[in-house]
Amino acid sequence: MKKKTSLSEEDQALFRQLMTGTRKIKQDTIVHRPQRKKITEVAPKRLLQEQVDNSHYFSDEFQPLLNTEGSTKYVRPDVSHFELKKLRRGDYSPELFLDLHGLTQQQAKQELGALIAACRREHVFCACVMHGHGKHILKQQTPLWLAQHPHIMAFHQAPKEYGGDAALLILIEVEEWQPPELP
């Protein structure tokens, strides 16, 4: 609680003398609106929709033509093969990691869709997908799914420090960041 400052009798009289002929201001023009909370979290419905939208591209029936010799790799036709070389050498370090161990194929598709959506939303260019060895189902299917997605620019078997032949480093096409328009 604030302390009241007491004015001397002289100061009070001087104040009243200076304020004669004035009237109290009526507050009728400015409406104070309550401050809105900033939206920092993405709504769960939106996240689920992004996940579904991005996993829509993954088909088990379509088999893209991938090179079966050597390590697992893919580069989109409009992307430089030098990007693939940089992935192989480990020049890109992944910012997001996805572990698919123990997931079903359907769950893996959804998680891949969520990873791609998260990378695009957060402007993350490189990510690592760890499919593991297991029964080789996800190891075989993951590259086929990724090659079908339009936002995947390239992928290559990860270097040893990121999982070796049990993981893939992927390059994701992200939208250029645009500053918000001012009114």
UniProtKB/Swiss-Prot annotation:
SMART domains the record matches: SMR
4Fe-4S is among the record's keywords: no
A molecular function (GO) term: rRNA binding
Pfam families given in the database record: Smr
Highest taxon above the source species: Bacteria
Primary enzyme class: hydrolase
Keywords, in A-Z order: Endonuclease, Hydrolase, Nuclease, RNA-binding, rRNA-binding
EC number: 3.1.-.-
Matching InterPro entries: Smr_dom, Smr_dom_sf, SmrB-like
BP-aspect Gene Ontology terms: rescue of stalled ribosome
Keyword rRNA processing carried by entry: no
Stretches assigned to the Smr domain: 98-173
Summary of the function given for this chain in its UniProt record: Acts as a ribosome collision sensor. Detects stalled/collided disomes (pairs of ribosomes where the leading ribosome is stalled and a second ribosome has collided with it) and endonucleolytically cleaves mRNA at the 5' boundary of the stalled ribosome. Stalled/collided disomes form a new interface (primarily via the 30S subunits) that binds SmrB. Cleaved mRNA becomes available for tmRNA ligation, leading to ribosomal subunit dissociation and rescue of stalled ribosomes.
Family, similarity comment: Belongs to the SmrB family.
NCBIfam families xref list: PRK04946.1
Assembly and oligomerization: Associates with collided ribosomes, but not with correctly translating polysomes.
Record's protein name: Ribosome rescue factor SmrB
